[in-house]
Amino acid sequence: MSEIGERVKKIVVEHLGVEPEKVVDSASFIDDLGADSLDTVELVMAFEEEFGCEIPDDAAETILTVGDATKFLEKNAKS
Amino acid sequence: MFDLTGKAALVTGATGGIGGAIAQALHAQGATVAISGTRREVLDGFAAKLGERVHVLPCNLSSKDDVEALVPAAEAAMGQVDILIANAGITRDNLFVQLRDEDWDDVIAVNLTATFRLARAATKLMMRKRFGRIIAITSIVGVTGNPGQGNYTASKAGIIGLIKTLGAEYAKRGVTANCIAPGFIKTPMTDALNDKQRETILAKVPAARLGTPEDIAAAAVYLASNEAPTSPDRRFTSTAGWP
């Protein structure tokens, strides 16, 4: 897993309080990791903070899985 | 109990009777306060009276840009915003059929839309910290209606709905949202009532007196504190018994 992937995973584990082994690329935040809609908003805010970039609403709507987040941040992370 | 040391509070309408009393009470409990209002010199005078732990942030709540800048300015000044007191409000009273569009728009903009924008910005900060206290000053007439105040009562009823929703959405994040619905409180706003109006009101109040800004401030201190219940949407009224 990429360095960004590891940081994404760490944030997801901390925010959702899930087992690290469940946080795989294909895991859906809502369907597999038990997040509700507010959790996903918070995750996006946490990603923005960690990676120093802005995630616009239309981009946030396409981030449904751990892999989606990693892919987006590999392209857009500033820190 | 009710110690607010280390907490940062933003109070709108701090130059008014109720807002001033709330800012003073939060400050007395140890909070750092950012006082906001339209009149810079009055705010400066108030700040000088309070002493340390005070920031002056003038803001015109009818301006979208001013409103959007206020919470970030408070965060920049205090490092955080733990408590938001959305207190500022205006009246443009008239008989319903004579209410002009601009009377409606002005009152909704300052009382309701600004409250929404400030609460939205503050909640974003608070949910990250897992602590926040949003307290909006509504009015008993938002529940009862009041002749001559179609715009004002609608704005205050709107605040109640907004705050109940906010409280329900963020309760799990440690952010509580509450309204205080004052009855007739002795302030410059109610000083404008004539004797006949005052008599009519007092006839309905079992305690036969107007409330005081300090009554409202005490409720605000409680709701801002760690001791306040974390269950959402408690609506407090302070009406000296009416209605």
From Swiss-Prot, chain A:
Carrier of the growing fatty acid chain in fatty acid biosynthesis. It is found in: Cytoplasm. InterPro entries: ACP, ACP-like_sf, PKS_PP-bd, PP-bd_ACP, Ppantetheine_attach_site. Residues 2-77 form the Carrier domain. Pathway: Lipid metabolism; fatty acid biosynthesis. SMART domains: PKS_PP. The gene is acpP. This is Acyl carrier protein. One of its GO terms (cellular component) is membrane. PANTHER family: ACYL CARRIER PROTEIN, CARRIER DOMAIN-CONTAINING PROTEIN. Pfam families: PP-binding. NCBIfam families: acyl_carrier, PRK00982.1-2, PRK00982.1-3, PRK00982.1-4, PRK00982.1-5. One of its GO terms (molecular function) is acyl carrier activity.
